[in-house]
Swiss-Prot record:
Keyword Translocase (UniProt): no
UniProt site positions, description: Important for autoinhibitory function: 48
Residue span of region Intramolecular interaction with C-terminus: 2-113
Taxonomy of the source species: Eukaryota, Metazoa, Chordata, Craniata, Vertebrata
Lipidation positions, renumbered (N-myristoyl glycine): 2
Modified residues (Phosphoserine): 200
Span list, region Intramolecular interaction with N-terminus: 151-220
Keywords: Cell cycle, Cell division, Coiled coil, Cytoplasm, Endosome, Isopeptide bond, Lipoprotein, Membrane, Myristate, Phosphoprotein, Protein transport, Transport, Ubl conjugation
Domain of life of the native organism: Eukaryota
Residue interval(s) of motif MIT-interacting motif: 201-211
Name of the protein in question: Charged multivesicular body protein 3
Length: 222
């Protein structure tokens, strides 16, 4: 506490160092999330191969869509790391300016990076907090409210994803799932019947496993 009950402001150098530490911590969180999603993706690939052997094209398509969503999520996480690196570089520049000018300066580079980072759900809470602190310190200007409110952008699977689904299925199954089909609706050869009861039980187990896998991937992406 300072005079008249006011909180003593931290020295600019201490603020910059604290921000840098928080950014590095969030980068480690993002790295872990990327690894988790990629590990889960390997399991999905194995499931696609198994489903392809049984001629379950519908299951393969569902899993391929999950892989597309996961790869998009990983791409966004890598982009967020690049933005965080930009902020870290900006913090180094602030320390250099501080030594010469004795105060922190506005940075358009940091501003742009932070505007992107506050939209990433995985790190949004920390980035919003950092943005407010940086605004207060005068490094960035006040961000528009819609920047904060546009975080809920759930992407739908677009028609153009069909080609990506085909490509993934062809790649994972080494061409076994059709010969580079033009549409995912192409039928596969029917598997040979081997007992109705056993097949029904297997299908139920596979559906449960598929739902569990989708749930794990959705949790990792959220």
């Amino acid at each position: 506490m300072g005079l008249f009950g006011k909180t003593q402001e931290k020295p600019p150098k201490e603020l910059v160092n604290e921000w840098s530490l928080k950014i590095r911590k969030e980068m480690r969180v993002v790295d872990r999330q990327i690894r988790d999603i990629q590990r889960e993706e390997e399991k999905v690939k194995r499931s696609v191969k198994d489903a392809a052997k049984k001629g379950q094209k519908d299951v393969c398509v569902v899993l391929a869509k999950e892989m597309i969503r996961s790869r998009k999520a990983v791409s966004k996480l890598y982009a967020s790391k690049a933005h965080m690196n930009s902020v870290l570089m900006g913090m180094k520049n602030q320390l250099a300016v501080l030594r010469v000018a004795g105060s922190l300066q506005k940075s358009t580079e940091v501003m742009k990076a932070m505007q992107s980072l506050v939209k990433i759900p995985e790190i949004q809470a920390t980035m919003r907090e950092l943005s407010k602190e940086m605004m207060k310190a005068g490094i960035i200007e006040e961000m528009l409210e819609d920047t904060f409110e546009s975080m809920d952008d759930q992407e739908e699977m677009e028609e153009e994803a069909e080609m990506e689904i085909d490509r993934i299925l062809f790649e994972i199954t080494a061409g076994a799932l059709g010969k580079a089909p033009s549409k995912v609706t192409d039928a596969l050869p029917e598997p040979e019947p081997s007992g109705a009861m056993a097949a029904s039980e297997d299908e139920e187990e596979e559906e449960e496993a598929l739902e569990a896998m989708q749930s794990r991937l959705a949790t990792l992406r959220s």
